Amino acid sequence: MQNKKIVILYGSETGNAQDFAHILSHKLKRLHFSHTLIKIGDYHPKSVLQCKYLFIICSTTGQGELPRNARENCNGRAQGTLWQFLKKSTLPADLLDHVNVAMLGLGDSSYPRFNFGIRKLHERIVNQLGASEIFPRLEADELGLAGSNKDTGNGVESVYYEFEKRIIAYMLEKYPNRKHDGKMMPRVGLAEDVYLKPSNILEISTVNGSTNDQLPDSKIQFVGDETIRHGTVKKNNQITAKDHFQDVRQFVFETEDHEAYHPGDTVSLYPENSDNDVELFLEAQPHWKKVADELLTITDLENCDRFRDGGVVKPLTLRTLLKYHFDIVSIPRQSFFMKTWTFANAHEDRPTDQELLEQQRDKLRQFGYGQDLQDLYDYCNRPRRSVLEVIQDFEFLKLPWEFALDYLPMIKPRFYSISSAPSDPNVELTIAIVRYKTLLRKVRKGLCTNYLLTLTENDTVRYKLQNNHLLHEDIIGKPIIMTSPGVGLAPMKCLIESNLFKDQYLFFGNRMKDKDFLYEDTLSMWKKEGKINLFTCFSRDPINSPHAKYVQDQLWNQSSLIADLILKKSAIVYICGSSGKMPVQVRLTIVEILKKHGNFENAEEAEHYLKEMERTDRYMQETW
């Protein structure tokens, strides 16, 4: 039973905040603290009035925004969410004075608005609406350079475990005893090898027979999410050279209702596993294979949030769950091991070898409960080892399929920027196919991009369209400086075709002019027509790019122009591409340009000017 007085809320873009929230929930359950665990966007606003202890773990996305599942509900609507409610100006200053709150922010200090998500929540919930902090807000930095782990070199995990330790100590101090069978007794945690059964359990349906001959693949349906749309594939063309190692796709589909979209909007696609990976999983768990095509039901389905985004597959079997819902090719997170290590036991499909069994159980337990995560990182993250491969490695791991919804990660939609013109009846995406070799010398493929490679003309794709409201009226009509290496070009292409800006300057970079100059003909035509001012660079092609290796080099080469646009014409700077060094170097270059040409007295003034640009959305950054 959920306890409305103790609530764990999370807002997560990549899954880190979600996993930490699930770990915290797992630890509290083992101490017999019943509670509610839910995404911020799905938490009913009125429930906060009954809450006494509120634990929030939240990351930051975009221009310092809350993650999508924090500002929208599972149906993609912001209306009626907790955040919309909390932003109401009419709320009294003591609305949350009954709430004791602890907050953890997950961020990356290479972004200008580091941990703004949790800071927004903190400002509103604590400073403006009266909630009491159990302890000061903690902030983690993926780079280990800022926030609560500043200068320590420690990752977000160390900050999370400090957060967890403080919460558990606080709750045990408040409630050292618990009531059991009408009597008070000391609050002692469950032994680690005791598995906590979830509320959502898979059961074989009372309908007899398998599904093999009942519903062919063409009859696969998804129910429970009315916001899902179905597009028809029109193009799936490689737009890099055929002999180039990076396959980039122009992926075009016709929308179901010809929905309107705008520059900066995105589309989420719902991928699926390959039949081969599904079969490999079933072979690694023979007891699953025996019932793989039996019809299933889910207990307490109405309170299962795992299918709210995208709906649940019908017919529901282990095979269809593995194909359409369980992300068996993702890298397992610590919570996976925390919940499954106890299932490593001698069984009929694996001859008993007590020494090996103990080794495997100890290793799985260490991955699940160890606070020094280096071994887990070396085993899973560094070689990009998948859930499927873990199950193949640990032969004694016999997973009960009945509890699969508790420990297997779910396939999440993948988000892509729209690159077609807003007037186009179709949606065009520009997608880099993920394919690489790891330390294990195995070829890795991205789940969604591998799925996209299987799609041909007239195939159906499941999608949702997100209106992100990137641009506001105050900046439209001004000059714009667009910096976009690689597929970061996608939203720029949409923006250029929208004709919303007076003068458009595009700085595009990639590796080789003859291999991956994306949309070269289109960009060259726009340059000839005077639609854009185009500056290119190619990092591995010094013949065609002798004076600029990276986009920041080309910006510096045009420093006088850039300074004039920013300082005299109030130009907008928009950066889009992969995270890491690029956005940091571009920002540093812009600061140096301002220092050189801006007549600022010192570097601090130039930095202050750029921060003011960020505050007023004249400097925008979208990276992934």
Swiss-Prot record:
NADP(+) binds at residues 539-540, 548-552. Residues 226-474 form the FAD-binding FR-type domain. GO terms for biological process: iron-sulfur cluster assembly. The keyword Flavoprotein applies. Signal peptide: none annotated. HAMAP family: NDOR1 (MF_03178). FMN binds at residues 12-17, 59-62, 106-115, 142. It catalyses: 2 oxidized [2Fe-2S]-[protein] + NADPH = 2 reduced [2Fe-2S]-[protein] + NADP(+) + H(+). FAD binds at residues 384, 414-417, 446-449, 624. Keywords: Cytoplasm, FAD, Flavoprotein, FMN, Mitochondrion, NADP, Oxidoreductase. This is NADPH-dependent diflavin oxidoreductase 1. Residues 6-168 form the Flavodoxin-like domain. One of its GO terms (molecular function) is NADP binding. Its EC number is 1.18.1.-. It comes from the Eukaryota. InterPro entries: CysJ-like_FAD-binding, FAD-bd_FR_type, Flavdoxin-like, Flavodoxin/NO_synth, Flavoprot_Pyr_Nucl_cyt_Rdtase, Flavoprotein-like_sf, FNR_nucleotide-bd, NADPH_Cyt_P450_Rdtase_alpha. Pfam families: FAD_binding_1, Flavodoxin_1, NAD_binding_1. Its cofactor is FAD; FMN. Gene3D superfamilies: 3.40.50.360, NADPH-cytochrome p450 Reductase, Chain A, domain 3, Nucleotide-binding domain of ferredoxin-NADP reductase (FNR) module, Translation factors.
